Regions:
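Detector for C-terminal structural segments
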Residues: 27-30, 191, 289-317, 355-365, ...
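Gly/Pro-rich hinge or "lid" segments in bacterial periplasmic/extracellular proteins
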Residues: 157-209, 213, 221-223, 330, ...
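Ligand-site clamp/hinge motif
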Residues: 173, 201-247, 374-376
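Alpha-helical secondary-structure segments
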Residues: 106-113, 141-147, 183-184, 211-213, ...
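A structural "hinge/loop" feature
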Residues: 37-53, 76-77, 103, 125-126, ...
Length: 495
């Protein structure tokens, strides 16, 4: 063999080895794309679902947690006892749990986290989840007692939310940019506008995940999302933003579709304290001006289920109330005239980044214009939407998908961004919280759905479908989305 041929053969062998090493690396690492970049990484102080996409069950954990099928199971609490009167929950914590900085996780951290979430000055977006807690008592390093003001059949469910994760007091100052949790993955790096990197936690208290490293890649543009997936620059895309491309992925043997349900009630949110939306007749007119199916077909290419209230159709307590707000432009015009707006009016329609909002907003604006309502569209980045709409309540209309699980209770919060204030509804939610009987709870949930539907608090559009795309070898990604999360702990590559 000539020197040159031998050199070429050696080069080929080295290239093959490098290729095999690359393949091996790819089978322990994963890159998952998502459309929205989180504003920061503290799930206990903001409503952005993109935060939980990255950190839920990966970096941070709570006493309980959601599984992909929606069930609530043990998390940092390995077990619990409930007193006969339902007022005391004694949680027994997992042993050997450490935070990523090496410090031990104890009952003191649980008390700190729950007290911080329910404090008067708490910035927790779901502070209401903790409102019924009367006291949190440390019994010993691995036992904590949560005392309630009244029985709460939802407590274990509430503690599974991303807003209820356990954090260490000494890490709070840096939590937004350098999160330190107890989860199976540690935070490594955040390149703003590009990606977040996580690595497997070698000291994790539970079962070790199959993945050694994960990268969350942020791709906001639907065209760029399609290009990245087709080029295999990413291994999966959670909630793919261009549903019109899904059939192409389905026909490509390199990929698979993960189509399921979410908790995302997509609504035309209405500022109930801003004239003229403080008038129920105007809100009712809005509801009858909207053709839900046209929005689902035009913006979502058929992926979505019409809803008539703020409740998921796959929930056993769901009732179909879409008939309360059927598409009827003539009725919408008559209601506007009755409300004193025969000539219509102008309002704002502030839209966050997701394609359901941007594409749906264009369709809705045209539908409203047909009955005399002129919606001036303003496209916002997610951080702007949170500041102007969610916190500032400076809007007339907006479109957003509420992806939190079983969140009809937000309508009992008069300070919530759409500012619906109904004492009777608030009383109903209080009674629901104190009720554990499943038959009674179903009846109350159905009453709650009916009340907000008949009050036309918001325009109820559709239940968002889970539409993710992954390479054929990716296993264990959630098909359904019982909460906002990309849970890495069960993801692996096929052998």
């Amino acid at each position: 063999m000539s020197h040159r041929l031998a050199k070429h053969a050696l080069t080929s062998v080295l290239a093959l080895i490098a290729s095999l090493n690359s393949l091996s690396a790819a089978e322990t690492d994963i890159t998952i794309a998502m459309q929205l970049e989180p504003p920061h990484l503290d799930p206990t102080s903001a409503a952005a679902g993109a935060i939980d996409n990255v950190v839920y069950s990966n970096v941070f954990e709570g006493l309980t947690r959601f599984m992909g099928d929606g069930s609530v199971v043990a998390g940092l609490a390995k077990s619990w006892n409930i007193s006969a009167d339902g007022l005391r929950y004694t949680f027994h914590l997992q042993t050997g749990v450490t935070f990523h900085d090496g410090s031990s996780m104890t009952a003191d951290d649980v008390k700190f986290s729950l007290d911080r979430a329910r404090a008067e000055d708490s910035t927790n977006a779901q502070k209401a989840l903790f409102a019924g807690i009367a006291d949190v008592e440390v019994v010993d390093p691995h036992t904590v007692v949560v005392s309630l003001q009244a029985p709460n059949g939802n407590l274990l469910f509430n503690l599974a939310w991303g807003d209820a994760v356990i954090v260490a007091p000494e890490t709070i100052d840096g939590i937004k940019s350098n999160p330190v949790g107890t989860g199976a993955f540690t935070f490594v790096n955040w390149v703003q506008g590009d990606k977040i990197e996580l690595a497997r936690n070698p000291n994790y208290w539970g079962a070790a995940p199959a993945l050694e490293a994960a990268t969350f890649k942020f791709i906001s543009d639907p065209t760029a999302a399609f290009a990245a997936m087709m080029a295999e620059d990413v291994d999966a895309f959670q909630s793919f933003p261009a549903p019109e491309n899904l059939p192409q992925f389905d026909a490509d043997p390199r990929f698979k579709l993960l189509i399921g349900s979410t908790e995302g009630e997509t609504i035309l949110s209405t500022n109930n304290k801003m004239p003229p939306f403080d008038n129920k007749l105007v809100r009712q007119a809005l509801a009858h001006a909207i053709d839900r199916q046209a929005i689902i077909d035009g913006a979502m290419f058929g992926y979505g289920t019409p809803i008539g209230s703020h409740f998921a159709p796959h929930n056993p307590a769901y009732i179909d109330l879409t008939g309360n707000s059927n598409y009827d432009p003539a009725k919408a015009k008559a209601l506007l005239a009755e409300a004193g707006f025969a000539d219509g009016f102008t309002t704002t329609l502030k839209l966050p980044q997701p394609s359901y909002a941007r594409r749906g907003g264009e369709i809705i604006a045209a539908q409203l214009r047909a009955v005399g309502i002129y919606a001036e569209i303003s496209n916002l980045e997610w951080a702007q939407w949170l500041e102007q709409v969610f916190r500032g309540k400076d809007y007339g209309l907006t479109i957003v998908s509420h992806t939190e699980p079983m969140d009809i209770g937000i309508y009992a919060r008069p300070d919530y961004y759409f500012q619906y204030d109904n004492p009777a509804f608030q009383d109903l939610m209080t009674r629901l919280t104190a009720t554990s009987d499943p038959v009674q709870r179903t009846a109350m949930l159905q009453e709650a759905q009916t009340v907000i539907s008949q009050e036309y608090v918001n325009g109820y559009l559709f239940q968002l479908a889970a539409t993710s795309v992954a390479k054929i070898g990716v296993q264990g990604m959630w098909v359904n989305a019982p909460t906002q999360a990309i849970d890495l702990t069960g993801i692996s590559w096929a052998d």
